Amino acid sequence: MFHNSVKAHKIADVEVGSFLSSGVDSSYVAAVADVDKTFTVGFGKDEKYNEIGWAKEFSKAIKKKNYSKVIKPEEYWGELKHIQYQMDEPLADPAAIALFFVCQIASKQVKVVLSGEGADEIFGGYNVYSEPNATAYDKLPRFIRRGIGSAAGKFHSRKGVNFLVRKGKDLEERFIGNAYMFTPEERKNLLKIETNAPDPQEITAPYYEKVQDCDDVTKMQYLDLHLWMAGDILLKADKMSMAHSLELRVPFLDKEVMYVAEQIPAKYRVTRKETTDKDTPYVTKYAMRLAAKKDTPKETEKT
């Protein structure tokens, strides 16, 4: 099914390439796609921000040529204004900058690229999706969690307070999307003037209403699929690629792939890891990772 999607997205009269990071999404796409060129960017030498070394090893393993670029500080700041201009509107997502540069190097080699956007939203790839079942604390009665959360909110600087406050609220109250900087309360304290902007819950309520009978993981994915992915992920992907006259295609968002993803039970999207690692006790995109293992080189697997 995914192979068919990649094959369909490769149909073009021009050469097609593939973006490649160390993540399973782009790796899966690049491994399945029979393209000659992959493209990667990074910052500095720290592996946390520079995946070029791994991308070159992976490309070599799948017999493809990798084109890469280390983004220098002066290039970052030098293009920032131009990148914001290309976005047409404010977007507080620094990932747009790396995307701009990887599109830049790809556009010099190909006219169409395949990318891994959408996999996190449909297969359950964000760590926050493990939150609903992450602790035994959730088994406490709701009124007790609310009481503890309300009391904990008075001690802003204490470690663990945010966890207790969040767990004292229902999912519909605490989860307003995959990424945000300030809570509504913090926003009101920071802004010097009153605004007529709706509260986040007013925006998310219609979406939660449509999945009110679903499990919490599915609710979170549904919200991100309709707000985060549409308003950020795909928005910046389209605008950063078009800034370089490059066509970006997303095989994971083929309707057949999305249909299959929808049938996967939540426990196979985010599942408990058989490990003693207390910091990462859950595996995200579990079902998709199992599928990807069949096509990606074993020697390049990352934990």
Identify the residue ranges that each predicted region occupies.
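Structural motif
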Residues: A92, V211-D224, D277-V283
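A short, charged helix-loop
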Residues: A197-E209
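PAPS-dependent sulfotransferase catalytic core
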Residues: D295-T303
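Globin-like tetrapyrrole-binding proteins
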Residues: M229
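ATP-dependent adenylate-handling active sites, centered on carboxylate activation for C-N bond formation
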Residues: M1-D199, K239-D295
